UniProtKB/Swiss-Prot annotation:
Site (Transition state stabilizer): 17
Species for this entry: Haemophilus influenzae (strain ATCC 51907 / DSM 11121 / KW20 / Rd)
Gene Ontology biological process terms in this record: coenzyme A biosynthetic process
PANTHER family to which the protein is assigned, alphabetical: PHOSPHOPANTETHEINE ADENYLYLTRANSFERASE
Protein name (Swiss-Prot/TrEMBL): Phosphopantetheine adenylyltransferase
Reaction equation(s) it catalyzes: (R)-4'-phosphopantetheine + ATP + H(+) = 3'-dephospho-CoA + diphosphate
Lineage of origin: Bacteria, Pseudomonadati, Pseudomonadota, Gammaproteobacteria, Pasteurellales
Family matches, as InterPro entries: Cyt_trans-like (IPR004821), PPAT (IPR001980), Rossmann-like_a/b/a_fold (IPR014729)
EC number: 2.7.7.3
Main location: cytoplasm
Annotated signal peptide: none
Length: 156
């Protein structure tokens, strides 16, 4: 069975992330969403909270699995017998950075390629960073994030 992985910090997961997961789930029989610990980024939500928010956001997708990780992505890829890495790219800056990571991951995994998904037009400007900034300044992010994330932000 072809398995792909969509790694990220997902702090928080946005509707742009969810769109990429849904599109991947149509194409591939098994999609693993790997939520990175990333303590250096000083996340708004803990790893456990982010994993749970992603799980709640993809509950309608039967072929999607969600887990957290702190290891090197290449090691996670080997452990789960992954065929490809899914990455979202919004801008040329994203693409240049992701191209470098793709080459590095291909080297470290002995040939696992990265597949780049452009965003749906309505999510092209959305990022977790932008969502956090809007939220921290009292703005409304209801249209930018899945309902479980919006509810978690309201509860903070």
């Amino acid at each position: 069975m072809t398995s792909v992985i969509y790694p990220g910090t997902f702090d928080p997961i946005t509707n742009g992330h969810l769109d990429i997961i849904e599109r991947s789930a149509v194409i591939f029989p098994r999609v693993l969403v790997a939520v990175a610990n990333s303590p250096s980024k000083k996340p708004l939500f803990s790893l456990e909270e982010r994993v749970e928010l992603v799980r709640q956001s993809v509950v309608h997708l039967s072929n999607v699995e969600v887990f957290g990780f702190s290891d090197l992505l290449a090691n996670v890829i080997k452990q789960h017998n992954i065929s490809a890495i899914i990455r979202g790219v919004r801008t040329t800056t994203d693409f240049e950075y992701e191209l470098q990571l793709a080459a590095l991951n291909r080297l470290l995994t002995k040939g696992v390629d990265s597949l780049f998904f452009p965003p749906a037009e309505k999510w092209a400007f959305v990022s977790s960073t932008i969502v956090r900034e809007i939220y921290l300044h009292g703005g409304d992010v209801a249209e930018l994030v899945p309902v479980p994330v919006f509810n978690a932000l309201k509860a903070r």
